[in-house]
């Protein structure tokens, strides 16, 4: 049987309002650190930093 893939589903949480706005996948072998992206938050109505949560 084939091994389970290295990709895992993560959630991105706004650092200002703490809402989980985005869901994405990441390869834990290529990116072992926590993902941090600047994305639009519809609750804050502006671009904020979103950090990875599980």
From Swiss-Prot:
Keywords: Ribonucleoprotein, Ribosomal protein. One of its GO terms (biological process) is translation. Pfam families: Ribosomal_L33. One of its GO terms (molecular function) is structural constituent of ribosome. Belongs to the bacterial ribosomal protein bL33 family. The keyword NAD does not apply. HAMAP family: Ribosomal_bL33. This is Large ribosomal subunit protein bL33. It comes from the Bacteria. GO terms for cellular component: cytoplasm; ribonucleoprotein complex; ribosome.
């Amino acid at each position: 049987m084939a091994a389970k893939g290295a990709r895992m589903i993560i959630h991105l949480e706004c650092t200002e309002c703490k809402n989980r706005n985005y869901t994405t996948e990441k390869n834990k072998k290529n990116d072992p650190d926590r993902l941090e992206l600047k994305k639009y938050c519809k609750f804050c109505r502006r671009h904020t930093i979103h950090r990875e949560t599980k």
